[in-house]
Amino acid sequence: MKITVLGCGALGQLWLSALCKHGHDVQGWLRVPQPYCSVNLIDTDGSFFNESLTANDPDFLAKSELLLVTLKAWQVSDAVRTLASTLPVTSPILLIHNGMGTIEELQSIQQPMLMGAITHAARRDGNIIIHVANGTTHIGPAREQDGDYSYLAEILQGVLPDVAWHNNIRAEMWRKLAVNCVINPLTALWNCPNGELRHHTDEINAICEEVAAVIEREGYHTSADDLCYYVEQVIDSTAENISSMLQDVRAMRHTEIDYITGYLLKRARVHGLAVPENSRLFEMVKRKESEYERSGTGMPRPW
């Protein structure tokens, strides 16, 4: 399959290496155009992938059968709109990022839109990406008109298992959002690995109660207890991980808070729900961001 991977960070390189190893025809797409992108990855089994792959080739993009987007949430809309005019109108666009809200920004895109949530863990160590832990990628149609692309899940299952197709992906996206609303802001504010959150069950419960109320209003059945149990499972299984938001804060980069807690706050307002704990955490992360963005280091760059 001919695939363009938009974004060549940790997640992008994980997909590029896996697709390449399994015989797919792939290219990367970088914000600053370059003819090649270096992919240096150590997999969970210790094997090493080190290759320069084609990048930013518009002719390749014009023949691509899939655009796999692994950017930060706040980069997605501008980048996808830029590339959509060259991508075949029948080729699906699969968004894999933390948070929600990008689909609402891309309603006018003609290509089929799919969205996904991933639990694989990968991190950068210098110039090398380390695939820390295997996980599952959940994918499904982003809009009602986007149809059944379950064959893609089968193809990607053979590349980077596990991959699960959901006819209604939004329920799974909300579950992932609940996890992100707990783990990302708390670890970013407390500067700790995920496992440290085990000692803060009251805080986790307060966040999950608010998220559960919003999810119920969105039309998906859940409970605060169910969400807490799920979040605590994720905390245990990723105890040594440094969350993506904490990595961003440590590197003084723009975070995805607007698409995680920020998205929850938007939907809560629509439903007339008060979410004071999530509001407080949102403001604290935004304040931390503004401290280093004022100095110019972490300003979000245009795509």
Swiss-Prot record:
Keyword Plastid among record annotations: no
Catalyzed reactions: (R)-pantoate + NADP(+) = 2-dehydropantoate + NADPH + H(+)
EC code: 1.1.1.169
Pathway: Cofactor biosynthesis; (R)-pantothenate biosynthesis; (R)-pantoate from 3-methyl-2-oxobutanoate: step 2/2
InterPro entries per the UniProt record, alphabetical: 6-PGluconate_DH-like_C_sf (IPR008927), 6PGD_dom2 (IPR013328), ApbA (IPR003710), Ketopantoate_reductase (IPR050838), KPA_reductase (IPR013752), KPR_N (IPR013332), NAD(P)-bd_dom_sf (IPR036291)
Location(s), subcellular: Cytoplasm
Keywords, alphabetical: Cytoplasm, NADP, Oxidoreductase, Pantothenate biosynthesis
Pfam families: ApbA (PF02558), ApbA_C (PF08546)
Coiled coil stretches, renumbered: none
Ligand binding (NADP(+)): G7, C8, G9, A10, L11, G12, N98, A122, E256
Binding site for substrate: N98, N180, N184, N194, S244
Biological process, per Gene Ontology: pantothenate biosynthetic process
Enzyme active site: K176
GO cellular component, one term: cytoplasm
Enzyme class: oxidoreductase
GO terms for MF: 2-dehydropantoate 2-reductase activity; NADP binding
Quaternary structure note: Monomer.
Function recorded in the entry: Catalyzes the NADPH-dependent reduction of ketopantoate into pantoic acid.
Family: Belongs to the ketopantoate reductase family.
Protein name: 2-dehydropantoate 2-reductase
Organism encoding this protein: Salmonella typhi
Gene behind the chain: panE
